[in-house]
Amino acid sequence: MIIQRVVLNSRPGKNGNPVAENFRVEEFSLPDALNEGQVQVRTLYLSVDPYMRCKMNEDTGTDYLAPWQLAQVADGGGIGVVEESKHQKLTKGDFVTSFYWPWQTKAILDGNGLEKVDPQLVDGHLSYFLGAIGMPGLTSLIGVQEKGHISAGSNQTMVVSGAAGACGSLAGQIGHLLGCSRVVGICGTQEKCLFLTSELGFDAAVNYKTGNVAEQLREACPGGVDVYFDNVGGDISNAVISQMNENSHIILCGQISQYSNDVPYPPPLPPAVEAIRKERNITRERFTVLNYKDKFEPGILQLSQWFKEGKLKVKETMAKGLENMGVAFQSMMTGGNVGKQIVCISEDSSL
C-alpha cells in the first residue's frame, strides 16, 4: 500500500529558526500484511509542539527526547482509527493515540505502544486528546498542581507567558479553578489579549509587543506575582521574575524563545535576575510531565470533567493536510496559533 509521510529534509542549524522547507512529503510503501501484535491505523489528527524544535537538532540536549534523523519520518502526538488489527486488545474501529505517532497518512504500529481512547471524554472532539484532554492539558494541570503551590483563599496572583498557546491557555484557567484570585496572561497580539480576557476568564492580559512589559505587569499585578507559569523564557520571564514575591514559584513549562538557541535547558538566568530569585527564595525547577505518569489517568478525568461542565474552554487552530505539517509547525513557533495547533490529516473517522 502506498501512503504519504513527512520526513526531516534539513536541520535549521543550532541557532536557526525552523521553516516549512525543513520538512518534505514523500510516498512510502507499507507492508501488505500485519505481524502478530501490530495494527494498521489511519491518521486523523497530528500535533505540532514547541518541544519538537529540539528534535530538529543533531542533539536534543535532553535525555528523554531523541533527535529526528534526516530523511526519516518525523513523529509526535497523534490520534487515529484502527483499520485492521492483530493485537489482542485492539479491534477495527477503535480510536487510539500515541506520543510517538509517525507523520503518515496511514501506519502499521505496535499495538502495545498505543492507548485506546474514549470519544465520550471529549464529546466526540477527537483532536482534544492532543490538546486540552491530552499531553498539553496534563502538562498544565500537573505543572500547576505540583509546582504552583496554590492554596484557595490565599489571594494569589498567577502570571502565564505564552498565554494564548496550547499550555498557557489551559494553565491560566486551571490556576483560577484551583484557587488563584487573579490570573494575568502575556501574549503577542491585541486579538490574543482579548481572547484571554473575554473568552478564557483571565483578569488581565499584557501585550509584550506594545509598550513596556514591566510597566504593564506592575499595573496588572499590583500585589506582585506569586505563581509564574513560564512558557517562553528570555526577556519576558526576566521582567516577570523581577516582580515576583518572596517564597513564590516558577513553573518551568517551556522556553520557546530559547528553543532555537544553542543553550542548556533550562537556560540560566542573567546574574541580576538570578540574584533576585535567590534573595526572594523563588523556586525555579525544571518540570517534565513524563515524570508524573501515575497522575495521567486521574488528570485526564479531571480535565474532561471541567470541559464537560463548561469550566475549561478549549481553543484550537486547525490546519488541513499532511503537506501542511511544516507550515503549521513554523506558524506555531512564531505565534501564529491561538490555543492548540493541530493538523487534520483525515476528517472521516468512520470505516
From Swiss-Prot:
Substrate binds at residues 99-100, 288-290. It is an enzyme of class 1 (oxidoreductase). It is found in: Cytoplasm. Changing residue 259 to F: Significant reduction in catalytic efficiency. Widely expressed with highest levels in adipose tissues. It comes from the Eukaryota. Its EC number is 1.3.1.48. Keywords: Cytoplasm, Lipid metabolism, NADP, Oxidoreductase. One of its GO terms (molecular function) is 15-oxoprostaglandin 13-oxidase [NAD(P)+] activity. Pfam families: ADH_N_2, ADH_zinc_N. It catalyses: 13,14-dihydro-15-oxo-prostaglandin E2 + NAD(+) = 15-oxoprostaglandin E2 + NADH + H(+); 13,14-dihydro-15-oxo-prostaglandin E2 + NADP(+) = 15-oxoprostaglandin E2 + NADPH + H(+); 13,14-dihydro-15-oxo-PGF2alpha + NADP(+) = 15-oxoprostaglandin F2alpha + NADPH + H(+); 13,14-dihydro-15-oxo-prostaglandin E1 + NADP(+) = 15-oxoprostaglandin E1 + NADPH + H(+). Coiled coil: none annotated. NADP(+) binds at residues 165-168, 192, 208, 231, 253-259, 287-289, 337. GO terms for cellular component: cytosol; mitochondrion. GO terms for biological process: prostaglandin metabolic process. Functions as 15-oxo-prostaglandin 13-reductase and acts on 15-keto-PGE1, 15-keto-PGE2, 15-keto-PGE1-alpha and 15-keto-PGE2-alpha with highest activity towards 15-keto-PGE2. Overexpression represses transcriptional activity of PPARG and inhibits adipocyte differentiation. Monomer. Belongs to the NADP-dependent oxidoreductase L4BD family. This is Prostaglandin reductase 2. It comes from Mus musculus (Mouse).
